[in-house]
Amino acid sequence: MSSDKIFAEGESCKSAWHDATAGYDETDTHLEIMGKPVMERWETPYMHSLATVAASKGGRVLEIGFGMAIAATKLEEYNIEEHWIIECNDGVFKRLQEWATKQPHKIVPLKGLWEEVVPTLPDGHFDGILYDTYPLSEETWHTHQFNFIKSHAYRLLKPGGVLTYCNLTSWGELLKTKYNDIEKMFKETQTPQLVDAGFKSENISTTVMDLVPPEDCRYYSFKKMITPTITKV
């Protein structure tokens, strides 16, 4: 039913997202913005998997989307040198600034939509990238990660650098409506776009973990999660 979908046809939150209230619930297990389920604490093992990939080369890591600091906090446990984080929502960015003061590595908080910030970042600057932002429109629901990857991910990475990412809001819908095999979903809907962006298919790998979402999760109901590792050679 269309009423179950996260986005209505033609809906866009982009212009209002910056100022919208960041609704962290009392138990700090859910983050909701403009009525959208942005992140939930049950994702933790998966977020840690993404963070592990992004930190695997050490050095300077770029994280796009701060959310509940689940991946960010895990990244800080690794032997990295700098941790750059892009976040556009005011309330989430405030939490990022507070969190940054308590971390062991140099944090570079960058305020704004990634579309505004990323073009200002230099080529070959990062050893690892973790892209996990929320789709801000029905139009880009399934494709916003490719806009970043095709325009910027390859150029931002150093040779040997690694990219990982997710779009759970998209993948959850695809696994509900079109696919029952998560690896097939990734291979058919993601890999061709990564190759178009300049990455070689032999340098794209995935790992799958079992993780059962709570029954009330609106954006993901599949009982497996997939972590991509995409290396620039």
UniProtKB/Swiss-Prot annotation:
Domain RMT2, residue spans: 1-233
Report residues binding guanidinoacetate. M39, E43, D132, L168, T169
GO CC terms on record?
A: cytoplasm; nucleus
What is the E.C. number? 2.1.1.2
Record: residues binding S-adenosyl-L-methionine: W17, M47, F66, G67, M68, A69, I70, A71, E87, C88, N89, W114, E115, D132
Q: Which residues form the signal peptide?
A: none
Which UniProt keyword terms apply here? Methyltransferase, S-adenosyl-L-methionine, Transferase
* Catalytic activity entry: guanidinoacetate + S-adenosyl-L-methionine = creatine + S-adenosyl-L-homocysteine + H(+)
Where on the tree of life does the source sit, at the highest rank? Eukaryota
Q: In which pathway does it act?
A: Amine and polyamine biosynthesis; creatine biosynthesis; creatine from L-arginine and glycine: step 2/2
Q: Which CDD domains match?
A: AdoMet_MTases
A Gene Ontology molecular function term of the record: guanidinoacetate N-methyltransferase activity
One of the protein's GO biological processes? methylation
Q: What class of enzyme is it?
A: transferase
Q: Which family does the record assign? A: Belongs to the class I-like SAM-binding methyltransferase superfamily. RMT2 methyltransferase family.
Q: Relate the assembly described in the record.
A: Monomer.
Protein name as it appears in the record? Guanidinoacetate N-methyltransferase A
Name the lineage.
Eukaryota, Metazoa, Chordata, Craniata, Vertebrata
